[in-house]
Amino acid sequence: MTTPLKDKYELEVIPIAIGGKKLDLLGLANWDSFIKNLEEQGEEYIRKFPFWVKIWEASVVLADHLIRIGLGKEKDILEIGAGMGVTGLFLGAFGYKITVTEYEEDALELLRMNVEHNGLDTVTVKKLDWNDPDLTETYDVICASELIYNVTFMEPIIKLLRKYLRPGGTVFLAHDVRRKCMLQFIGMIPGKYEIENIAKTMKRDDEVHKVFIHALRLK
């Protein structure tokens, strides 16, 4: 029997506002002590780091960008590697129909909790294994933030995009400018896409974060 998320982590409500709407997201409460405990494990730190517990600046920037440009309420949207699901949850808050996916069971539980907590009835949460994807639908838009932090993910994601993006569809990928893996990934993308690179900035806790958004439009 799996341990409930609330018994593994101390959770708190984190209010976030994007595009004039506010969501109350359940997230990690003891962030500083959590990171300190992981760092004390030395080499195990990165391997064990649960990337899904952090609200990445790129996910906030991506949500804001997609809300501003407008995607069309009739479109089917997929978020991959959702983590905390900031982008997908806010798209749902604005009435978009979106499937939000993750692989880690704890991340999936937290996503479902936040969907229920915020009453987002246009958001569906599904498990997705990039190496063995089993979704039955295709999508007009696929989005992700801070998706690639390991080169071994690149080929499976290229195949996943090819499998699930509809003709004429668009992929939106957002990342901090310091993430070199994503720039390497964009260089591997086949010539079937027209690529637009968009630079954004976000100020958070007196720090300016520079974020790239890559819009890949299937020709």
Each model region followed by its residue ranges:
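S-adenosylmethionine-dependent methyltransferases
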Residues: 1-219
